[in-house]
Swiss-Prot record:
It comes from Francisella tularensis subsp. holarctica (strain LVS). Gene3D superfamilies: 1.10.10.200, 3.30.70.980. Transmembrane segments: none annotated. GO terms for biological process: regulation of DNA-templated transcription. GO terms for cellular component: cytosol. Keywords: Cytoplasm, DNA-binding, Transcription, Transcription regulation. This is Probable transcriptional regulatory protein FTL_0929. Pfam families: TACO1_YebC_N, Transcrip_reg. Belongs to the TACO1 family. SUPFAM superfamilies: YebC-like. One of its GO terms (molecular function) is DNA binding.
Length: 248
């Protein structure tokens, strides 16, 4: 299937990733640790841990670092005080936003998340206010230049739900979240190394934005992602290649 240009959407403002690399690794390690604490250190018996490991590997985390996080989680440690919290709300232009957190202080967290929404012209909503607009799925993204036919054959045989080829040649492989890590492993074994891979909440309908609104939404997402206890931020904003180039 053909789709709109998505390459720049994989992670908006891609150039900022290097500066945020340490923070990204911290969030990935936290997810691995909590997944191991809740479901045990055996990835074959713990789908959440398996998915967390696949995402970490896609972000070039070393196997030694991953193993240390698993051992830490499986052994208990300070992660026992961390709880998972989800917040939902609306950003500028009515964009739907989901914020997943891991925190040891729920009151502090909700206060700072609410502040970020309010300062950006949005508002924090109630549980379920926007979640119905999203579907949880795995997305494995490849840069332009990959052999589309070969990738499609391997991905579909491995159990992928859909494959989208975008106008710029980038490709997204969509999976059931439970099959995400297995399909990712098969693709790696066959020589297909992704640019990004994660289990995410994908919006069924995207919100189209003008340049000014898109810039405000990006700023809000950046504020939320910069909070230490925020693990992931999802939105239904359609950050097109054109918008990102205009914003710079």
């Amino acid at each position: 299937m053909a789709g709109h240009s998505k390459w720049a959407n994989i992670k908006h403002k891609k150039a900022k990733e290097d500066a945020k690399r340490g923070k990204i690794f911290t969030k990935l390690i936290r997810e691995i640790t909590v997944a191991a604490r809740l479901g045990g250190g055996d990835k074959d018996a713990n789908p959440r841990l398996r998915a967390a490991i696949a995402t970490a590997l896609a972000n070039n985390m070393s196997k030694d670092t991953i193993e240390r996080a698993i051992v830490k989680g499986a052994g208990g440690d300070e992660s026992a005080n961390v709880e998972e919290v989800r917040y939902e709300g609306y950003g500028p232009g009515g964009v739907a936003i989901i914020v997943d957190c891991m925190t040891d202080n729920r009151n502090r967290t909700v206060g700072e998340v609410r502040h970020a929404f309010t300062k950006s012209g949005g508002n924090l909503g109630t549980d379920g206010s926007v979640a119905y607009m999203f579907t949880k799925r795995g997305i494995i993204s490849f840069a332009p230049g990959v052999d589309e036919d070969a990738l499609m054959e391997v991905a579909l045989e491995a159990g992928a739900e859909d494959i989208i080829t975008h106008e710029d040649g980038s490709i997204d492989v969509y999976t059931d979240p439970h099959d995400f890590s297995d399909i990712q492993e098969v693709l790696i074994e066959k020589g297909f190394n992704s640019e990004n891979a994660e289990v995410t909440f994908d919006a069924e309908t995207k919100a189209e934005l003008d340049t000014e609104t898109a810039e405000k939404v990006m700023a809000l997402i950046d504020k939320l992602e910069d909070l230490d206890y925020v693990q992931s931020v999802y939105s239904n904003a359609n950050f097109t290649q054109e918008l990102i180039e205009q914003i710079g």
